[in-house]
Amino acid sequence: MHRKIGGLVVSLTTVFSCSVLAELPEGYPADYQKVVDAGVKEGKVVIYSTTDTKAAGPLIKGFEAQYPGIKVEYNDMNSTELYNRYISEQAAGGGSGDVVWSSSMDTALKLATDYAEKYASPELSKLPKWAVWQQKAYGTTYEPVVFIYNKRLIPQGDVPDSHTALAKLVTAQADKFKGKVTTYDIEKSGLGFMLAVQDSKADANYFADLAGMAKGGLTVQSSTGTMMERVSSGENLLGYNILGSYAEARAKTDPSLGISYPKDYVLVLSRVSFITQESEHPNAARLWFDYVLSEKGQSILANQADIPSIRNDIEGKNDIDGMTKMLGNALKPIPVDETLLEYLEPKKRLELIKQWRTAAAK
């Protein structure tokens, strides 16, 4: 009995000390302290994410330092796996993630329509209106979509600076680029499919340009990492529809990898996140969610993980302001709204895949 009481004292002391250490974020309302205290008592937050663990590492470390006593259980998976896993777990009625964070904006929003908790983050006023859907799904990043190329094997004068220029280059040098252009397999990659939809909306010549890129045979992959690796090695020469955040991070240590920001239009992806209605750790989930959107969390993403910030008040150039100064009106941010769901309707999805297969010769 004495041992049990002693254990209880230790347990309560631990919770109390963690609550004291986990201070109210600057500028937040006083009653947010209740969320902090409850989150510390919950002790854990489970994240389902497409952002790889290495990139998210500094963010996780910063959050756990901000809120001692809350452990982040981070599950890194591709967008299709995340969607299918979450749906299956909901159908089975078992435990699942507290927060979903996905680069596949359309499937993330589809999940949010059925499973997201409505939550007005204290950071809401710092975000662009197009990045928030019904205070349920929030865009968290501002990531241009780029071309990559092998700097050793493609002369600077040949580097394409538009989607049409890319197609013309491959058509004009068909022998050189035969089987050497890579992009997403839109049937295996949720992100790849979503970007193909957005390309088709942004560019009336999309399918014609895609056919030009595919003249010598298009190589398709389901992973950004694989595409960058193959372009860097010379197995492929050009990569199309690559997340600029990953490309910029790799280019810092890979002298073979070049990046081109197209001048005709640059799609901008924003990783979509939401708190789940059935969260087992709802207060810890809110703390994580707000931390990701906060100036501190966004600074970590921008300056340590090389993922551009959705905010405009982050130190350095890796935020909305910095991207706007660099790319101007070419930027086409993808809004977090119902238009993302249009091509998830089975008939429209199949129609687009059929068009893509024809153009890509797949």
Which sequence ranges carry the predicted segments?
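Bacterial N-terminal signal peptides that target proteins for export
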Residues: 1-9
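Extracytoplasmic ligand-binding site segments that recognize negatively charged/polar headgroups
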Residues: 46-60, 73-87, 95-235
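A ligand-binding cleft/hinge motif common to bilobed small-molecule-binding domains
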Residues: 106-111, 232, 237-256
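Immediate post-signal peptide segment of exported/extracytoplasmic ligand-binding proteins
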Residues: 22-46, 65, 175-178
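Mature extracytoplasmic/periplasmic domains
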Residues: 271, 276-337
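Conserved C-terminal helix/tail region of periplasmic/extracytoplasmic solute-binding proteins
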Residues: 28, 332-362
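Short, hydrophobic alpha-helical packing/hinge segments within bilobed ligand-binding/sensory domains
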Residues: 35, 82-83, 107, 227-228, ...
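N-terminal signal peptide c-region/cleavage motif recognized by signal peptidases
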Residues: 17-19
